[in-house]
Regions:
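A structural signal for multi-pass alpha-helical bundles of membrane permease subunits
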Residues: 2-219
Length: 219
């Protein structure tokens, strides 16, 4: 039974990864090979004319991306770098702040905690068009337009509610007995959070980071 489950997982993993592998292979093809009706997926360095499933790998596609295109001011790699920097920093900020906030809601008796959690979640209910004008006016006032910092603040604020709710569920599953034993040994709350909660919440933080990164990247 275990082998059957493992086989099913491998089968679905191959189906999920195959399009990514095909895209990666196609990026090294020439224009003629990429639009060929024959599925050419095996690279070869043979100088003779290839046929069938073989193709000559080339880096022309990546060279074209290094130049500005379609009236753009910069190359594709410049925009890719900006997206990566903004996405990574906003993800780290959202997961860090969300984990700290979730720990407070999970372990302390906060008056009106349910209302506060609903308020945090309700920030995702608003359609983007409802906040475009206020955000634009605020960014103009503080000169945050067309800046990395402005986008990082925006994406962090947008993903913070998701981070809080996801991390609260993960932290709730961590037994409080670990913290009680640490308190008896003289640990402070900060040491408990850093040495006990965070290491056990790493899987949840990883999942949350994936969601936040996808959200920031798609924007």
């Amino acid at each position: 039974m275990k082998s059957l489950r493992f086989g099913v997982v491998i089968f679905y993993a191959i189906i999920a990864i195959s399009p990514l592998v095909w895209l990666s292979v196609t990026s090294f093809k020439s224009k003629a090979d990429s639009i060929s009706t024959t599925a050419r997926f095996l690279p070869t360095l043979d100088d003779t004319e290839v046929d069938g499933i073989y193709f000559h790998p080339t880096l022309n596609g990546y060279r074209l991306l290094s130049k500005p295109y379609a009236g753009a001011e910069h190359s594709f790699y410049h925009y890719l770098f900006n997206t990566a920097v903004i996405g990574i920093i906003s993800t780290v900020a959202a997961v860090t702040l969300g984990t700290c906030c979730a720990y407070g809601f999970s372990r302390f008796l906060i008056p009106g905690s349910r209302d506060w959690l609903f308020f945090i979640l309700s920030t995702r209910f608003l359609p983007p068009l409802a906040v475009v004008i206020p955000v634009l006016m605020m960014y103009r006032e503080f000169d945050l337009q067309n800046t990395h910092f402005g986008l990082i603040i925006l994406y962090t604020a947008f993903n913070l509610s998701l981070s809080v709710w996801l991390m609260k569920g993960f932290i709730d599953d961590i037994p409080p007995a670990f913290e009680e034993a640490a308190l008896v040994d003289g640990y402070s709350r900060m040491h408990i959070f850093r040495r006990i909660i965070v290491p056990r919440a790493v899987p949840g933080m990883s999942v949350t980071a994936v969601f936040c990164m996808i959200s920031a990247w798609n924007e």
